[in-house]
Amino acid sequence: MFVVHSMRLFTGASFRRNLMTSRRLSRKSCLSDSSTLEYSFSLYNKYCVTKKLKIKTICSFIYYYLTITISTIKNSTMSAKHLRPNITHIPVKRSYANILYFGRSAQLLETDRNAGWTKAHETACNGNLEDYEEEYKEMDKHEIDVRDGFGQTPMWIATTRCNYRNYVFLKKHGSDLHQKDYQGRSLLHATANAVNSECLDIFKDLIANGVDLYQKDMVGSTAIDELKHENSIINYETEGTLLVTNFFIFLYKFTYKFIKKLLTICYCIFSIHFFSL
């Protein structure tokens, strides 16, 4: 009976209560004072070892997670530094379509795509739409968002050209910010491929106005996927400042891993505490 009660001493709320119980049991079993003291010290040592094991295990998990997190942030920062150019603006030509978007002259736009190419498209590309304020006041919405052969509107052209003034002007006159071209690409897709500080302002404004960052085009690519390409605003800096912080991408990329590791740590702590009872 004494042995059974001694095993239960480890399930008490505190060592003091366990110690009082051991003394009471020792008196009942006619144990000497020296035996009681020796047993109390052994109980205390086991209690300390168990508690130290818990603390050491928890600290090990925390140290492991912080090490992984710091190394990940460091690697992402270093990879971004290797991609920083010395000039501010670099044209992106990942495809024939991008060559048309960022054409060096209007001659690149004289193709079959321009069945619907208008003066508004040309001005959004190379001019200032604010000069046509009076004409836009009399336009309907479908006239403002007139499409060319690729399904692109003046708003799309202004966005891909990183013309923030034309973007704000068309937005003020009711242009649809949730529009898509014939390939299912949103304005965020177009902005993500640019390397201009004004395109970052447009990118942020589109997100603030509720444009879906995870909207997919016809090939299943999202604006986040476009940001992962080398020729995107995420990999360039203007005047010494990164256009998009590495922390934003880090949160997006490692949120799932963070939650998974956190649950693993909680499970281990619970298991250690449960089996030590």
UniProtKB/Swiss-Prot annotation:
Mapped ANK repeat ranges: 150-179, 183-215
Keyword entries, A-Z: ANK repeat, Repeat
InterPro entries per the UniProt record, alphabetical: Ank_Repeat/CDKN_Inhibitor (IPR050776), Ankyrin_rpt-contain_sf (IPR036770)
Top-rank lineage group of the source organism: Viruses
Record protein name field: Putative ankyrin repeat protein L81
